[in-house]
Structure formats: structure tokens, C-alpha cells
């Protein structure tokens, strides 16, 4: 009985695979060229984006990097509002006082490490 089910499943999979349209070499080459163009465009915009070199944002302001936020314990935090990512400068990591203190200590370490990201 299991062999019969196995045979039916294989038959259906083969039928579905045979029904799918095959791509021609021209279509594959066109998709490859489009991907290469997209990659070149992305790399170009990525390399020309200016990065922050020192703090310029206060608590609550939007940010992209930790080094943009002024303050030893202030970091660029990410929150999701309505499924959309939002970054802002924040020094609060938890509603629990002890965990918040630990989080601020981690923010200090994170700010130190992000200094390398902000050079240039």
C-alpha cells in the first residue's frame, strides 16, 4: 500500500515538472544580464553612500549607525512598527532596571566596535 502511494506521488511530481515551461538559453542569458546590471547598480550606490564620522543625532532622532548617536550608552536601536523597520537613537534596552544597566554596558561596547564602521 505504501509503495502504491509512493508511486502516485512520484507520478504526480513528474507530471507537474513536465508541465512547467522550460526556459530558452536566450531567456536565461537575459536574466543573467539583468542580475549583473542590478548587482553593479547596487554596488555603485552602496559604495557612494556617505557614512557618519561623528555623532550628530540626539536621543529619539532617526539614525543608520551607532556612531551617529551622541552619548556613551546611546545606540542606534531598531524597532518594527507595523512591520516596517525604524532606527532611532536610544539608551533604553529594557524596562527592568538591572537588565537596562547591562544593556547600556553592551551599548558602550557596541559603540566602541562601531567606530571602525564609521571611519571614512
Swiss-Prot record:
Role of this protein: Weak insecticidal toxin with probable ion channel impairing activity. In vivo, induces paralysis when injected into sheep blowflies (L.cuprina). Shows weak toxicity, since it is only toxic at high doses, and flies recover within 24 hours.
Post-translational modification: Contains 4 disulfide bonds.
UniProt KW keywords: Cleavage on pair of basic residues, Disulfide bond, Ion channel impairing toxin, Knottin, Secreted, Signal, Toxin
GO function terms (MF aspect): ion channel regulator activity; toxin activity
Assigned protein family: Belongs to the neurotoxin 25 family. F7 subfamily.
Free-text tissue specificity from the UniProt record: Expressed by the venom gland.
Signal peptide: 1-19
GO cellular component, one term: extracellular region
Domain notes: The presence of a 'disulfide through disulfide knot' structurally defines this protein as a knottin.
Residue stretch(es) of the prosequence: 20-51
Name assigned to this protein: U3-hexatoxin-Hi1a
Top-level lineage group: Eukaryota
Compartments it resides in: Secreted
Amino acid at each position: 500500500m505504501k509503495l502504491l502511494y509512493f508511486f502516485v506521488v512520484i507520478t504526480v511530481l513528474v507530471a507537474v515538472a513536465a508541465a512547467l515551461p522550460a526556459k530558452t538559453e536566450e531567456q536565461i542569458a537575459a536574466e543573467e544580464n539583468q542580475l549583473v546590471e542590478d548587482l553593479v547598480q547596487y554596488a555603485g550606490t552602496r559604495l557612494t553612500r556617505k557614512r557618519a564620522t561623528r555623532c550628530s543625532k540626539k536621543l529619539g532622532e532617526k539614525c543608520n549607525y551607532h556612531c551617529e548617536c551622541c552619548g556613551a550608552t546611546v545606540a542606534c536601536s531598531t524597532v518594527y512598527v507595523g512591520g516596517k523597520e525604524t532606527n532611532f537613537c536610544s539608551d533604553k534596552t529594557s524596562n527592568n532596571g538591572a537588565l537596562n544597566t547591562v544593556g547600556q554596558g553592551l551599548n558602550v561596547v557596541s559603540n566602541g566596535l562601531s567606530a571602525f564602521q564609521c571611519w571614512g
